[in-house]
Amino acid sequence: MSFGGEGGREFMLDGKPFQIRSAEIHPQRVPRAYWRHRIQTAKAMGLNTIAFYVFWNQLEQPDGSWDFSGRNDIAAFIDLCQEEGMWVLFRPGPYVCGEWDLGGLPTYLIKDDVTPLRYTGNQQFMEAQTRYLEKMAEIAIPRLSRNGGPILMVQLENEYGSYKSPHDEMAYIEWLKDFWTKKGAGPFYLSEGS
């Protein structure tokens, strides 16, 4: 996936213009037995891509362990999209909104600390976020389109422009971009409120 065409404003896939027609299906909200049907239904509607959020607070358990079973098996969902001939827009957050408790962030991040989240000056948040994103990278990197997988792009953050941090820092977005770039991901996108 790259940008090109007239004025460099078209999505290009394998050197040809490509229009992303996407459905939003969050596997953590859908019983696993229905995943394939939902993906097939999106494809039958003429769509070619599945976008989905990952809810961090469903994966990281209160004891610090990680649960990638059942609806949380993000890798299996991506692989199923590929089996069904669909591309993927990977939206791991860490904040996803999605009308989900704390936007998918684990509640331990706000238990004792009043320092803003989504801020590079919050060491607890940055360390926890790094642990989470390492898990996401293990899943995503081998499944990027450049590696033969279905993931076209990685969303760096969700609705960050709508988030009014007292620090109003772009360093946070740059940190996310650097993290994913060092892992070999790209291109990236942001999604802002309309």
Per-region residue spans from a language model:
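Active-site-adjacent "subsite" loops/lids of carbohydrate-active enzymes
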Residues: 96-138
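A generic structural signal for short coil/turn motifs at secondary-structure boundaries
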Residues: 30-31, 60-64, 161-166
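Active-site neighborhood of glycoside hydrolase catalytic domains
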Residues: 124-194
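Active-site beta-loop-alpha junctions enriched in small/polar residues
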Residues: 26, 55, 93-97, 156-161, ...
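Aromatic-lined substrate-binding rim segments of carbohydrate-active enzymes
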Residues: 35-103, 107-109, 176-186
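N-terminal carbohydrate-binding accessory modules
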Residues: 1-49, 79, 83
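Hydrophobic faces of well-ordered beta-strands that scaffold small-molecule active sites
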Residues: 19-23, 48-52, 88-92, 152-156, ...
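Solvent-exposed, acidic/flexible segments
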Residues: 28, 32, 67, 71, ...
